[in-house]
Each structure stands twice: as C-alpha cells, then as structure tokens.
C-alpha cells in the first residue's frame, strides 16, 4: 500500500499503525474515531466505506483462533514444516474490535482499515454522518455482537427477530437450542 505524503501520523488520534499481508490498519481510540474518519475521508480521499465488521476476541489467545490451533506452549499443528512451533498470537488490547474497511478511488486506488477497540458495554460513535453506507453495517454489529453505537439514527435489530435474546456472534453466546421435528419423524 502507498503511504500518504507525510505518513499516517497525520491521522488525528492515531494510536498504532499495523502492516500485515500488504494491508494497513490504523488503530484509534473510540473517542478519536470520528476525527480520524473525517480526516481519512476529507484529506486523504477515502470516500468509500466498503464494510464494517465487529469481532469478539474473548479468550484470545487461549483458544484456536485465526488458524492457530495449538497449546499455550506455542505448538501449532497447522505448521508441520516448522515442527509445529510458532509464537503465540499477541494479546488483544480489549475484548471487541470494530473494523472499518475504506477505499480511496480518486487518484490512486488504495485500501486501509480503521480499527477501534472497546470493552463490553463501552460505546463507539456512529460513522453514519461520515459514511452513510455504515447504517446497516453498524446495525448488524449491534444485532450480532452487541456493540453499542452512539448517535446511530436507527439502532435496532436488522437480522434477528426483535424479541431475540442475546447476540449470536459473541463468543459467550450459549450454544444449544430447541429440538426440531422434521417431517417423517415419529
């Protein structure tokens, strides 16, 4: 990815810049999200929000996550050429992450991910005033993961029934259900 003139350091409230697999992630605190989003849109040309994702990192790195299937000692059975030894994934700063996938298409097409972290119940501001396409994405993050989004114009469930209890994509969501009778069963 092409770094803008002057580097990413000009993004307001920037806490960290991560480069992995040719992708750039800009990490900001929730209170700096809107300023960073407006700067990326207005000054750096990231006018297109392609996706918003919410991720629950409960239990990281204790569980097999993101291809890591191993033990606390670092043995990963997915890496036979390295005798199954790999460093443990880095601890995450908080339980939940919101990722905003942005695209600049005007002069030189490029992508960047804007990321913010929060604990359970800690709100994140809505980016709908910056990118109106975030509307349904943020509703999905609320509905499926339980992210509290301040200032959203219509924060109601979008996928689950209105009377559904809980948020199904959370790692602590109870598994199980009710038995279902299929036709032909006695």
Residue ranges and their predicted role:
Residues 1-186:
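Terminal low-complexity/charged segments
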């Amino acid at each position: 990815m092409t770094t803008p003139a002057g580097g990413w350091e000009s993004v307001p409230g920037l806490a960290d810049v991560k480069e992995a697999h040719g992708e750039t992630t800009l990490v900001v605190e929730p209170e700096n999200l809107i300023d960073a989003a407006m700067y990326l849109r207005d000054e750096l040309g990231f006018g297109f929000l392609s996706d918003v994702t919410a991720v629950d990192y409960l239990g990281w790195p204790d569980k097999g996550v993101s291809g890591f299937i191993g033990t606390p000692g670092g043995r990963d059975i997915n890496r036979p050429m390295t005798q199954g030894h790999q460093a443990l994934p880095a601890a995450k700063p908080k339980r939940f992450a919101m990722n905003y996938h942005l695209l600049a298409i005007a002069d030189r097409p490029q992508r960047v991910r804007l990321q913010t972290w929060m604990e359970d119940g800690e709100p994140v501001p809505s980016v709908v005033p910056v990118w109106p396409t975030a509307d349904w994405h943020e509703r999905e993050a609320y509905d499926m993961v339980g992210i509290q989004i301040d200032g959203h114009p219509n924060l109601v469930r979008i996928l689950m029934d209105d009377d559904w209890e809980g948020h199904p994509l959370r790692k602590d969501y109870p598994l199980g259900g009710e038995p279902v009778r299929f036709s032909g069963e006695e």
